[in-house]
Amino acid sequence: MQRLRWLRDWKSSGRGLTAAKEPGARSSPLQAMRILQLILLALATGLVGGETRIIKGFECKPHSQPWQAALFEKTRLLCGATLIAPRWLLTAAHCLKPRYIVHLGQHNLQKEEGCEQTRTATESFPHPGFNNSLPNKDHRNDIMLVKMASPVSITWAVRPLTLSSRCVTAGTSCLISGWGSTSSPQLRLPHTLRCANITIIEHQKCENAYPGNITDTMVCASVQEGGKDSCQGDSGGPLVCNQSLQGIISWGQDPCAITRKPGVYTKVCKYVDWIQETMKNN
């Protein structure tokens, strides 16, 4: 678990990749060596929870995903998220932090585009069934609501995505999006939002790919020949099918985009009642 947490905490900076540290922490050659060891161990395990990347996708048409949000901790991109109401975001529970800076309405994270909105958020509601003590071992109920301090203004560039209690079936074409790395195992972090078209696969094939790790609240998606996937770098982002939110990017295989090893998503249709009740009570 700890080694995967270290892998998740790597980030992008203007000079390349640096290891994220808690405020006040100091690095040392010994710590740097330990970080490298943990990363190599995490890669060796194969299964990776957390931050995802869009592999072999394409640059999204600017502002074509107006529900897409980016969760930052200060200047560090933590996860993706989906706007589902003026004050509410849906993301993965393993993205839990005490405070976020939320960026919406952006395509290029390094440019001011005139339509972006920024909010803070300190209230998070992970699903009560999520095992936060084992965030990279137990992937069940990997879903969380985040309440922003103030509502966003609904514009052409910032707009909520519809939820649906009707689950999609195998063969449905869907879209994933995020700002994570565009290659695996090497990390190449884009500035602009990336998209990929993928397809929902049969539940039995999903179980066969990850024996003992798949529940009925998870859904798998990929392309049959491999090559397109979500993986480390931007967890919590949306899986959009038929213009509704059907999945939250959760976990999968590393290296990513391997044939017969699809990405695994939290099946949002199974949680609509919990989402609505949590928003109503808070």
Swiss-Prot record:
Keywords: Disease variant, Disulfide bond, Glycoprotein, Golgi apparatus, Hydrolase, Ichthyosis, Protease, Secreted, Serine protease, Signal, Zymogen. One of its GO terms (cellular component) is Golgi apparatus. Residues 51-53 form a propeptide. CDD domains: Tryp_SPc. Residues 53-280 form the Peptidase S1 domain. SMART domains: Tryp_SPc. Possible multifunctional protease. Efficiently cleaves 'bz-Phe-Arg-4-methylcoumaryl-7-amide', a kallikrein substrate, and weakly cleaves other substrates for kallikrein and trypsin. Cleaves synthetic peptides after arginine but not lysine residues. It is linked to Ichthyosis with erythrokeratoderma: An autosomal dominant genodermatosis characterized by early-onset ichthyosiform erythroderma with excessive skin scaling and peeling, and erythematous hyperkeratotic plaques. Lesions are present at birth or appear soon after. This is Kallikrein-11. It comes from Homo sapiens. The gene is KLK11.
